[in-house]
Amino acid sequence: MNLPRFLLPVVALVAAASAHAEITWLTDLDQAKAVAAKEKKAILVDFTGSDWCGWCIRLKKEVFDQKEFSAATKDFVLVELDYPQKKKQSAEVKAKNKALSEKFGIEGFPTILLLDSNGVPFAQTGYEAGGPVKYLAHLADLSKANTAEGKAKFAQGKKDEGLVRGYGEELEKLITPLLEKKDLAAAETAIAKFIKDKAVTGAAKVTLSVNARVGSVQACKPGDHTAVLKVLDEIIADNPADLTGELKEFRAQVAAAQAADKDKK
């Protein structure tokens, strides 16, 4: 096909743009919400430390910068909120990003937060090895939680995290003197009383129990896998099955470590 000469530069520009198309990342969450509402998409927010966080840099290089990841834009409006150490940012951007990290309870980088078009979170993840195709499948699986029930469950999980953090600090102060004396029995009694008195239930109870009890065993009986397994079995037996899935996986890891130690002897 012969094209008029004045169209050739235009065609060349279009071809170049297609060949080197870049994925668009917004840097303003309010703008992203407006776009998401209009296009009926969810929002993916990357909380990153672009010039210092090793895992953030790997995630960008291995996943976000790969052409296959452009498929994510079919379902998500992409947002990057950066928390650099050397890169210059305006005071306004720093303040806005800080407020968002506090609002969503971001504690580490990279954190990938998935929101509905109104900005309500329903899932959270981070670095995952395997490249863009595997990561897209991971996002598709997480997107199943973009329901009223999923968002409520996510909100409860965040609430539990805050509860566990606060109670964990209190409990640590309470049992540290006992652990310094290697008095595991007294520490166990104090932990049980604390959880009962605070009326901690559900996933928060499981997490608090594991952190405090396993930590106590490790402090008093370092390297004793049998003692750790005993504690884990008690916690698993004392809580509903739907709350102990990850705990059972952890138990399997401890059992494997125990078996490996026996093989070395």
Which positions does each model-derived feature cover?
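Bacterial Sec-dependent signal peptides at the C-terminal "C-region" and cleavage site
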Residues: 15-23
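Non-globular targeting/processing and membrane-anchoring segments
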Residues: 21, 139-265
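Non-catalytic, surface beta->alpha helical segment in thiol-disulfide oxidoreductase systems
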Residues: 62-64, 99-147
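Bacterial N-terminal signal peptides that target proteins for export
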Residues: 1-8
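Bacterial N-terminal signal peptides
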Residues: 8-16
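Local sequence-structure signature of Cys/Sec-based thiol-disulfide redox active-site neighborhoods
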Residues: 27-69
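Extracytoplasmic/secreted proteins, especially bacterial periplasmic and envelope-associated proteins
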Residues: 27, 31, 55-58, 68, ...
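Thiol-based oxidoreductase modules, predominantly thioredoxin-like and allied folds used
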Residues: 23-27, 48-49, 62-95, 106-109
